[in-house]
């Protein structure tokens, strides 16, 4: 669902930022 997609995008961003 949309929440799953949002969580995936946030996870990718966090990995890229190294947070």
Curated annotation (Swiss-Prot):
Cell compartments where the protein resides: Secreted
Keywords per UniProt: Amphibian defense peptide, Secreted
Keyword ATP-binding: no
Top-rank taxon, per record: Eukaryota
Main localization of the protein described in the UniProt heading: secreted
Disulfide bonds: none
Keyword Secreted: yes
Tissues with expression: Expressed by the skin dorsal glands.
Entry's Gene Ontology cellular component terms: extracellular region
One GO term (biological process): defense response
Record's function text: Shows antibacterial activity against B.cereus, L.lactis, S.epidermidis and S.uberis.
Entry protein name: Uperin-2.8
